[in-house]
């Protein structure tokens, strides 16, 4: 959306965290390439051009964590640290007009209280003491941390002890680097052999991994060298040799849901071989190949991949321990820190999950008002946030208002038809 905004004349400041500003070129360039290829395939005009991507960086304003930025005389924003991924932040918006009550809005964005690569800085006490309105995510608002099974390391150890090779689909940013970090720890602890080669495929994952190791981001110095021993980069030229090589191996490749990226090129050989195990470490949405494998939809049934029909013979494993979103108890713990919580707007989750989490917040009784964002139209008024009406009610009123106009047009058409018939 940023290049599209710039294309249509936006020339204001684009505020972001310092780490995001250093990762953004990778993300936007990749998005542009995907969009360009899609538009060529569908024979439609691209939404924006490469120069629009470049324009974004002209307006970029990297911000320090915890340092207030005066956007204009009445609005101030402050970024606070967030463990979701490197570069993530939570934002405090403070709105102040002479003679009016100050309004404070805290937006969590995608939130996680910790990150394997850094110590997440605490939000200062003064923020929690403000009269506050919070927009909070709820991706896992119906799940507790105690429900998460931390099975990855034990399962990897057991798979390799069975002399099987391991195929791990990963997200290019965050997940690929975290799993490489854990595999290195397992090597150092003697839980997996350093003799087993570890490969990383996927151009985007390579770019992010190089950036993570560069020292430019807020990654702790002792964690910069997270690549395991016997590690190898894989590209389109070396890929055939990796697959043809004998002996045990571990392959990490994009995409995490198995629907795109180099993963598709490996799958026909991997999935049909009982000497392989596939370990899904990312959230897989409905209808993706990853989800279908987790749900065992291809039991005794052929699956078509890259034009080949194969049967699933590889062992399928999955885990939710790498999720980059807080669970319900962690979200409640964050909200509980606010001493004067006026309004909580629950956002970013499945419809039922948002409702369940909103009910938990309401029952916890530490917020004066709790709403599910999207169920109602909410606007900013002089004295705070006001719920106008439900989306259904809005539609009903709109339809009712439009009905007389439709009736009027209908009557007019009938009169015209009558006049025409008389003239004949």
Identify the residue ranges that each predicted region occupies.
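Glycine-rich phosphate-binding "P-loop"
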Residues: 136-150, 168, 221-227, 312-332
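Amphipathic alpha-helical heptad-repeat segments
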Residues: 27-28, 33, 299-302, 306, ...
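Short acidic-hydrophobic, aromatic-tinged amphipathic segments that line or gate anion-handling sites
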Residues: 58-66, 228-237, 372
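Hard-cation-handling environments
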Residues: 153-292, 301-304, 338, 347, ...
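Core dinuclear metal-dependent hydrolase active-site scaffold
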Residues: 62-121, 241-246, 250, 261-265, ...
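Short, compositionally biased "basic patch" segments
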Residues: 117-135, 284-311
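His/Asp/Glu-rich metal-coordinating catalytic cores
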Residues: 1-197
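Hydrophobic/aromatic beta-strand patches that form the interior of the parallel beta-sheet core
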Residues: 15, 61-63, 78, 106, ...
């Amino acid at each position: 959306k940023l290049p599209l905004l710039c294309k249509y004349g936006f020339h204001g400041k684009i505020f972001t965290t310092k780490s995001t500003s250093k990762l953004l070129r990778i993300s936007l360039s990749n998005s542009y390439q995907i969009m360009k290829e899609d538009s060529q395939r569908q024979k439609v005009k691209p939404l924006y051009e490469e120069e629009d991507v470049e324009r974004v960086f002209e307006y970029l304003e990297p911000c320090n964590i915890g340092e207030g930025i005066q956007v204009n005389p009445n609005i101030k924003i402050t970024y606070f640290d967030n463990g979701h991924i490197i570069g993530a932040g939570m934002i405090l918006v403070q709105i102040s007009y002479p003679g009016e009550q100050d309004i404070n809005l805290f937006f969590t964005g995608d939130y996680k209280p910790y990150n394997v690569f850094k110590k997440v800085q605490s939000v200062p006490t003064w923020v929690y003491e403000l009269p506050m309105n919070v927009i909070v995510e709820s991706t896992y608002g119906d799940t507790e941390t105690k429900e998460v099974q931390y099975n990855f390391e034990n399962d990897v150890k057991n798979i390799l002890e069975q002399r099987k090779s391991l195929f791990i689909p990963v997200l290019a940013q965050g997940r690929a680097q975290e799993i490489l970090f854990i595999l290195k720890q397992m090597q150092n602890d003697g839980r997996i052999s350093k003799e087993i080669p570890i490969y990383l495929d996927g151009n985007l994952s390579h770019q992010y991994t190089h950036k993570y190791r560069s020292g430019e981001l807020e990654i702790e110095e002792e964690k910069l060298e997270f690549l395991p021993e016997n590690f190898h980069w894989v590209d389109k030229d070396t890929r055939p040799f990796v697959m043809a090589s004998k002996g045990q191996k571990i392959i990490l490749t994009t995409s995490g849901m198995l629907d795109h990226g180099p993963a598709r090129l490996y799958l026909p050989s991997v999935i049909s071989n009982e000497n392989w195990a596939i370990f899904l470490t990312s959230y897989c949405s409905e209808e993706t190949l990853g989800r279908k494998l987790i749900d065992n939809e291809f039991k005794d049934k052929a699956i078509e991949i890259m034009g080949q029909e194969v049967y699933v013979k590889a062992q399928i494993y999955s885990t939710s321990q790498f999720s980059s979103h807080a669970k319900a108890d962690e979200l409640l713990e964050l909200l509980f820190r606010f001493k004067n919580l006026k309004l909580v707007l629950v956002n970013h989750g499945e419809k039922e999950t948002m409702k369940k989490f909103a009910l938990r917040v309401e029952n916890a009784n530490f917020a004066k008002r709790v709403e599910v964002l999207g169920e109602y139209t909410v606007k900013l008024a002089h004295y705070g946030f006001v719920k106008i009406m439900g989306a259904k009610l809005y539609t009903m009123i709109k339809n009712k208002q439009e009905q007389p106009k439709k009736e009027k047009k209908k009557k007019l058409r009938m009169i015209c038809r009558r006049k025409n018939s008389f003239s004949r």
